[in-house]
Regions:
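Active-site glycine/GP-rich loop and adjacent strand/helix microenvironment
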Residues: 1-52, 60-67, 75-82, 167-502
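Active-site diphosphate/adenylate-binding microenvironment
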Residues: 27, 31-96, 106-111, 118, ...
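Short coil/turn connectors at secondary-structure junctions
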Residues: 105, 141-143, 242-243, 269
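Short, charged helix-to-loop "capping" segments that act as catalytic/coupling loops
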Residues: 105, 115-119, 263-270
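Conserved AMP-binding loop of ANL adenylate-forming enzymes
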Residues: 130-176
Length: 502
């Protein structure tokens, strides 16, 4: 009997428990809220908001405000100084370093011991449980898994608090038994210089029997490409003949899918999306034929959703399919009614399944067009399909007024395979955006409000060079896809040596 068959039996009880997500979503979420309130009622935050008097969701909403990072920052800073019982019981030792706010370069998201085990690691375990349920012939544990971690090794900060990328924190605290089926070595995984780490990982992993890989698609592709160059091979299965699954998250997979399918031609290869962030682990793609993800309802996360078209937050049982919501979470790491910054759309409410539609700050609405990241991904996928092009990285922002008084969207795109006709690619992208976004279509009518979009071709490695200059190469760092501001795109254009306008 294979090792996977033996280990797989451990996941059977959880596979059965996940069936509760089909029709007990509200009950699961109410139980999570009750646990969070009871656990934190004697903390400073719990006393200040009278947690002991909260009897249900309505009381919770009436007594606890919706918070941004800035509003919790003072408490988090005190926790980092070593104070206890502030937002969550006891002392919180670990803090996940995340991209910053308007006022700060970085955010420091508390990661409690309970949150580490019952949110972050629970998500990893459930990803495997669901994969094994869907693929009973899997042999993933008969080999090793390549886990691509973040670019900041955990380091001692204030009062012995520890700070690092979430992925680095997970590697630091992982069960030692997992190291028996994982590559690379911990020292390599936690290297801060991504360019050095990429080569070390390739060297350590190329002669191993790797069956599964986990990480951010863009950075994993860089590692795999490096390994192909070292080995002189064309396809990944020539190096790892038993590779079978890629657990990916952090950025949308659509722009990278074609490149992975060219790199890995094995018919046994599977791709499974997860939604994990510094703040928690929220969703898993439970059906390989459906790009939407199952919302994980029985971790230490209570969800609320703010309609992007206006209105008060609603609990899970108040959401509607097809609407765009900003996600709000309360967690066993001490985040209370915290705006995470992501937007989602539900595709089903039985079970609760969703897609990530974008970021609350990553959109273009300069002229009332309300373009979101999901629109952009669909538009690019269509243009690539029609032209045979492949997009590696991109960003877009508005041009508010040029010398001819014309407003438009400006796209900066790095292609791994350039379209033969860039004008046609731009036309197809513009056409598809109008088909899927009625607001964009209305603003494009007769070019009155919004002119035809402009595409500028980025030179090779432009986006990586930009991230490197900002000290954000590798790990969970990502390129902002859409922005109402020109701050990012202007910085990128100044670095760009190729001006291939449409």
């Amino acid at each position: 009997m294979s090792l996977t068959r033996i280990i797989g039996k451990v996941f059977v009880p959880r596979q059965r428990a996940l069936e509760r997500h089909l029709n007990e979503g509200e009950a699961l979420q109410r139980a999570v809220l009750d646990h969070l309130i009871e656990a934190a009622k004697d903390t400073e935050y719990g006393r200040n908001h009278a947690f002991a008097t909260i009897k249900g969701y309505d009381d919770f909403v009436g007594q606890v405000p919706v918070n941004t990072y800035e509003e919790l920052k003072g408490d988090i800073d005190r926790m980092r100084q070593g104070e206890t019982d502030i937002l969550w019981p006891g002392r919180v030792k670990w803090y996940a370093k995340s991209s910053g706010t308007t006022n700060d370069k970085s955010k420091f998201i508390p990661v409690s011991s309970e949150g580490l085990q019952k949110i972050h690691y629970a998500g990893g375990r459930d990803s495997v449980a669901i994969y094994l349920r869907n693929n009973p012939q899997s042999r993933m544990f008969d080999g090793k898994g390549l886990i691509l971690g973040g670019s900041h090794a955990p380091n001692y900060n204030l009062k012995d608090s520890l700070v690092g990328d979430l992925s680095a924190i997970l590697i630091e605290n992982i069960n030692p038994l997992v190291n028996l089926v994982r590559v690379p070595k911990k020292q390599t995984a936690l290297l801060s210089d991504f360019e050095v780490k990429r080569e070390r990982i390739a060297q350590e992993a190329m002669n191993k029997n790797v069956t599964n890989i986990s990480g951010v698609p863009s950075w994993m592709l860089s590692v795999l490409t490096c390994m192909m160059e070292m080995t002189g091979k064309k396809h990944l299965e020539e190096v790892w003949p038993n590779i079978e699954v890629f657990f990916h998250g952090g950025v949308a997979f659509t722009p990278y899918r074609k490149q992975y399918e060219q790199l890995i031609t094995s018919p046994r290869m599977h791709y499974m999306e997860t939604y994990n962030a510094s703040e928690g682990f929220f969703g898993i793609q439970d059906d390989p034929t459906d790009k939407s993800m199952l919302l994980m309802l029985d971790y230490g996360v209570f969800y609320e959703f703010i309609p992007m078209d206006g209105g008060d937050p609603v609990p899970l049982w108040g959401v509607e399919t097809g609407k765009n919501y900003a996600m709000v979470i309360s967690t066993s790491c001490g985040l209370w009614r915290y705006e995470i910054g992501d937007t989602v759309q539900f595709t089903s409410t039985n079970p609760y399944k969703f897609i990530i539609s974008g970021r609350t700050k990553h959109f273009i609405n300069a002229f009332g067009e309300e373009l979101i990241v999901d629109n952009a991904e669909q538009g690019l996928a269509y243009a690539c399909e029609q032209t045979g092009a492949e997009v590696l990285e991109y960003t877009a922002a508005p041009v508010f007024m040029d010398a001819n008084a014309k407003c438009r969207h400006q796209w900066l795109i790095e292609f791994s395979k350039r379209p033969q006709d860039l004008q046609l690619f731009a036309d197809l992208l513009d056409k598809r955006l109008q088909e899927i976004n009625s607001d964009y279509e209305a603003k494009r009518y007769k070019d009155i409000t919004l002119q035809h979009l402009e595409i500028i071709e980025a030179r090779p490695n432009l986006f990586n060079d930009w991230l490197k200059l900002r000290g954000k190469l590798g790990g969970q760092n990502k390129v902002p896809r859409l922005s109402n501001s020109r701050e990012h795109i202007d910085q990128l254009l100044s670095l760009n040596k190729v001006s291939g306008e449409r």
